[in-house]
Amino acid sequence: MPQLDTSTWLMMIMSMFLALFIIFQLKISKHNFHFNPELTLTKTQKQKTPWETKWTKIYLPLLLPQ
């Protein structure tokens, strides 16, 4: 059974990591990041739910005999 030649694996793995590192650096360098982000307040409009617009009866809980 022939032996598997693993002498080039280290070079392949190292070159793969280097290539991935360069690719990710190029991708990240294209993004624009804001240096001083400020909060923007958005006005939220309150939507009325159906039970807020209608009158509903509120019942007392049933009285249990003591």
Curated annotation (Swiss-Prot):
One annotated Gene Ontology cellular component of this protein: proton-transporting ATP synthase complex
GO MF term (any one): proton transmembrane transporter activity
Topology in membrane: Single-pass membrane protein
Keyword entries, A-Z: Acetylation, ATP synthesis, CF(0), Hydrogen ion transport, Ion transport, Membrane, Mitochondrion, Transmembrane, Transmembrane helix, Transport
Database matches in Pfam families: ATP-synt_8 (PF00895)
Spans traversing the lipid bilayer: 8-24
Keyword Acetylation assigned: yes
Localization, UniProt: Mitochondrion membrane
Modified residues (N6-succinyllysine): K54
GO biological process, one term: proton motive force-driven ATP synthesis
Residue positions where N6-acetyllysine is found in the record: K54, K57
Keyword Transport: yes
Task performed by this protein: Mitochondrial membrane ATP synthase (F(1)F(0) ATP synthase or Complex V) produces ATP from ADP in the presence of a proton gradient across the membrane which is generated by electron transport complexes of the respiratory chain. F-type ATPases consist of two structural domains, F(1) - containing the extramembraneous catalytic core and F(0) - containing the membrane proton channel, linked together by a central stalk and a peripheral stalk. During catalysis, ATP synthesis in the catalytic domain of F(1) is coupled via a rotary mechanism of the central stalk subunits to proton translocation.
Assigned protein family: Belongs to the ATPase protein 8 family.
Subunit structure: F-type ATPases have 2 components, CF(1) - the catalytic core - and CF(0) - the membrane proton channel. Component of an ATP synthase complex composed of ATP5PB, ATP5MC1, ATP5F1E, ATP5PD, ATP5ME, ATP5PF, ATP5MF, MT-ATP6, MT-ATP8, ATP5F1A, ATP5F1B, ATP5F1D, ATP5F1C, ATP5PO, ATP5MG, ATP5MK and ATP5MJ. Interacts with PRICKLE3.
PANTHER family, per the entry: ATP SYNTHASE PROTEIN 8 (PTHR13722:SF0)
This protein's name: ATP synthase protein 8
Native source organism of the sequence: Cervus elaphus hippelaphus
